[in-house]
Amino acid sequence: MSEVVHKYRVLIVASHPVQYAAPLFRLMSKHPQLDIQVAYCSLQGVKAGFDAGFGIEVAWDIPLLDGYPWVQIENNSPKPKLGSFFGLINLGLWNLIRKDKFDAVIFYTGYNCLSFWIAAIAVKLKFNKLLFSTDASVLEPRDQKRWKIWLKKMLLPRIFQLADIVMVTSTLGKQMIHSLGIAEQNIALTPYTVDNDRWISEANQVDVKAVRKQWNIPENATVLLFCAKLQHWKRPDDVLRAFAQADVHNSYLVFAGEGPLRAELELETDSLGLTDRVKFLGFVNQSHLSSMYRSADLFILSSDYEPFGLVVNEAMLCGCPVIVSDRVGSRYDLVKHGETGYVYPCGNIEALAKIIQEVLPDHECLQKVGTAAIKRMESWSPHEYIKAVIKALEISTSRI
């Protein structure tokens, strides 16, 4: 007689469709132990909209709503806006949660919008289980203001205590949540992942020679890639200066991304006499990213604030070795210095230049580290994420 598998009825409340979450929702919808419904507070990202970070209008060119059940909840805010507390006021969440029979509700909204509180109160009154997902890994805010750290230390324990389980995306995140007084048995590490199969498959089909030709870069050159918004906290200027200081023969630097620092970077590139060796591609959409990672020899994420950094996952899956600053959250779980990538002290241009100088011209080393990076990602995948979510559901629903 076959064992009866319990199926969890789960509502996922998400602020808006995200290119990283959609593949997870598709897999979750097919899992025999999950019956999910995704409730979106906004459809920004599906429709073209202005992205303040990129400084341009953005619409992702991969399907975000296919392959899983979802519903859009009307936003009753007079001034709809992501990232604003009163920008998401989705009153319909109340009736959805109160009238349907869910075993648990998972929040992907953050706590800084009114919709979270509307839904959280409904969950508590219905005696459903509340699972809160967060990618936070440090208490320090991006602007490093001390009063914000103090406020977080005071408020976050109370907020996270509302959850039956806090789902964190990294080991650093788990340590941070535990430091706020949340019991270890109430914290679940759910690996922050991308669609591993898609990235590996697309990378294997890339014509590197053709991509290099588009970039106007010789096929036998070595390429350092920066792929992120050109913003101050991403520190792209550190990468430019380290590249200039390393001065590796027959090497090029490619910036993929838009943002407020582009004009400054182009001026500095010109003043350094590197116009022929530094390429600015502008915004690159999702369907073209794998060709960039595969056509580069070394990837750099130099941020001084990066809770995780999923671009690291993407690069590693494409076999591109990574250099990350010690402020990048994924470094602890994914990047073992000298084996699956390299770590340097954030803002230390000399240290970064030294790594570039030693690694970029060493093709054998690049190949070895790139292969190890792909191997590491085998156990940091959507399948591990879903296993962890189901375990969190088992634990939370078994409690009275």
Regions from the language model: what does each represent?
Residues 321-325:
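Short hydrophobic beta-strand element within catalytic cores of glycosyltransferases
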Residues 218-234, 240-243, 254:
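Conserved donor-binding/catalytic core segment of Leloir-type glycosyltransferases
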Residues 336-338, 342-349, 358-363:
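Conserved acidic donor-binding segment of nucleotide-sugar-dependent glycosyltransferases
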Residues 304:
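Aromatic "clamp/platform" in nucleotide-sugar-dependent glycosyltransferases that forms part
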Residues 213, 277, 351, 358, ...:
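A short, well-ordered alpha-helix in the C-terminal region of glycosyltransferases
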Residues 114, 129-131, 138-162:
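Nucleotide-sugar donor phosphate/pyrophosphate-binding loop at the beta->alpha transition
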Residues 149, 153-210:
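Donor nucleotide-sugar binding/catalytic pocket of nucleotide-sugar-dependent glycosyltransferases
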Residues 283-284, 291-296:
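Short alpha-helical donor nucleotide-sugar binding micro-motif in glycosyltransferases
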